[in-house]
Amino acid sequence: MCIRDSWEIAGLLSPEPLPTFPNGFPKEVLDEFTARTGYQVLCNKPYSGTEVIKDYGEEHMKTGALIVYTSADSVFQIAANEAIVPVEKLYEICAEARRMLVGKYGVGRVIARPFVGDCAANFTRTPRRHDFSLVPPADTMLDVLQQAGKSTIGVGKIHDIFAGKGVSETIRTSGNTEGLKVTMELADRDFDGLAFVNLVDFDMLYGHRRDVAGYAAAAAEFNDWLPTFMDKMRPDDILMVTADHGCDPSYTKTTDHTREYVPFLIYGKNLRHGVDLGTRYCFGTIANTVCDALDVKACLAGCSVWNEIKA
């Protein structure tokens, strides 16, 4: 999951790249973090999330120091064993780090990474991860739709990605299976607006972990779910399927995101079928198309394809 790409899907192009720290965070950042939270720091490198708790988890449990690490993304991640730092305390620490990390150190996300276990052999991350994101610096399609009186329902981590900005209703989910269940239930609801859903398991559990079999099973689950959802859709409902980046589970040189083109699939019973939309230059195409479909005027990055697909 990449915050900047998700913002672009919503029609906001970040004018500058969010900062990354391939050599770890500067001493002044860590000193300020310790002064604010009272905790020392271990690691301070780009690291795989599962490997970092294996390599530093036992030292963390002995010393109480927090495991701070980053990745190729603009993130400040804090891992702590739930037996050493209760989850609510970890959230407080992350919230303080979020307040601290601004300006040139304004990472896209501060991420709480709780884990359990008593030794390196059995350390396991728990589902209680929580993201503390930068507030988008300008309006996105969520704000535009909300201001027009439309519902904006965020499912999964959408609230976290946009720091709640423009989200009128939040439904948190534990993974793909629950996300698909919630989306199916939303098809039965009578609302006028957007349900924005992210299925984070493709990224977090299978893409980054390079789990080809797990990714295939998740894709099969979605494929099995899709026909039932399409049958349930009302005549004026529209489904869009896309991604904010690649995360090829078969690419083994790194565990970071990969750079293939992402899909942009649109379906609606009252839309034209079989239209080739070509290769678009900007994810903001999605935001503008959503706004056009809902008859809401918007001035967002990208160009709508609504005129190409409407019947």
Residue ranges and their predicted role:
Residues 1-311:
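Feature captures the catalytic ectodomains and active-site-proximal regions of enzymes
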